A protein has these predicted regions:
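Flexible hinge/capping segments at coil-to-helix
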Residues: 38-49, 53-76, 91
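Short, well-ordered beta-strand core segments
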Residues: 26-28, 50, 75-76, 122
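Hydrophobic hinge/microswitch elements
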Residues: 96-140, 147-149, 158-159, 179
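Beta->alpha turn/N-cap motifs
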Residues: 15, 31-34, 53-55, 124-127
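C-terminal effector-binding regulatory domain of bacterial HTH transcription factors
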Residues: 6, 126-135, 145-198
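A local structural motif
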Residues: 6-10, 93-102
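Ligand-binding cleft/hinge of the Venus flytrap
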Residues: 1, 85-98
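Central regulatory/effector-binding core of bacterial HTH transcription factors
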Residues: 1-40, 186-198
Length: 198
């Protein structure tokens, strides 16, 4: 905002899909599949989906060794949980199944917070839980299994993609997120201490 002192931002946070025009929103940030095929969309980035749980939960329930072991665990379903239909790939091996959630939270931050509190295992975009992984509040599970990616897109309200302020905001976000996004690495997994940078 220091570069654009006249810029005004009205930030609305939530995982609900509002009508952008009715809400007076120029641009929205959306994770995952988009339902409005008429919207103007610009991809910002894609994060891998990861499974994570707290050490307290894992001390109590044990760690899953394969995706099918998840059936024996408390699952927290959040917005990145794909309605509980999870798919994993490891080399030539693929598995897909429906999981039952013990807890469903429709806000990403709430689902991550529930996992930090030891309520179960959550599937979430890596970028959404990176801090918790780095601080050791969460441990990444089954890192050798690919659970797909979640895209972050900028969705412009009808007729507002041409607004210079909306374009400048999205350009800034893309530059800032790609500048601060570390290269893909392996956050702490079972048996590892979290690696922190100074």
């Amino acid at each position: 905002m220091s570069r654009h002192p006249a810029l005004r931002i009205d930030l609305m946070m939530g995982d609900q899909r509002e009508d952008l025009v009715a809400e007076g929103v120029d641009v929205a940030l959306r994770f995952g599949p988009l339902s409005d095929s008429t919207a103007t969309v610009r991809r910002i980035l894609a994060w891998p989906r990861v499974l994570a749980a707290s050490r307290a939960y894992l001390d109590k329930a044990g760690a899953p060794l394969t995706p099918t072991d998840l059936a024996q665990h408390a699952i927290i379903l959040g917005p990145a949980s794909l309605g509980g239909h999870w798919s994993f790939r490891k080399g030539d091996t693929a598995t897909s199944f429906q999981v039952e959630g013990k807890l469903t939270i429709r806000a990403s931050l709430g689902a991550i917070a529930a996992a930090v509190e030891g309520l179960g295992i959550v599937m979430t975009p890596l970028g959404a839980c990176r801090r918790e992984l780095e601080r050791g509040e969460l441990v990444r599970l089954l890192p050798e299994w690919d659970a797909g990616t979640v895209e972050l897109n900028a969705v412009y309200a009808s007729g507002r993609a041409a607004k210079p302020s909306a374009r400048a905001f999205v350009d800034y976000l893309i530059a800032a997120l790609h500048e601060t996004e570390p290269p893909p690495s392996s956050p702490p997994s079972i048996g590892e201490k979290p690696r922190l940078s100074a």
